[in-house]
Amino acid sequence: RRRRRRGKGRGKKRKGKGKKRGKGRRRGSKGRKKKKGKGKKRKRRRRRRRKGSKGKGK
């Protein structure tokens, strides 16, 4: 149980932040408004995924 939770948590956090953040920064000032919208969506999606993964593990 410990190994599965650690692996999934670390992998999702690193992949999601690295890919999405890099794309927004490359576009520059034009992407400022888009960044705010994407940030809100990211939090909601992550919470839903975490709840589902915890339920399956139990």
Curated annotation (Swiss-Prot):
- Alphabetically list the UniProt keywords: Chromosome, Developmental protein, Differentiation, DNA condensation, DNA-binding, Nucleosome core, Nucleus, Spermatogenesis
Q: In which tissues is it expressed?
A: Gonads.
Gene Ontology CC terms = nucleosome; nucleus
Q: Does the keyword DNA-binding apply?
A: yes
Instruction: Return the annotated region ranges for Disordered.
Output: 1-58
First and last residue of the signal peptide: none
Which biological process annotations from GO are given for this protein? cell differentiation; chromosome condensation; spermatogenesis
**GO MF term set:** DNA binding
Q: Where in the cell is it found?
A: Nucleus; Chromosome
Task: Indicate whether Cytoplasm appears among the record's keywords.
Answer: no
Its biological purpose: Protamines substitute for histones in the chromatin of sperm during the haploid phase of spermatogenesis. They compact sperm DNA into a highly condensed, stable and inactive complex.
Protein's name in the database: Sperm protamine P2
Species, as recorded: Bolinus brandaris (Purple dye murex)
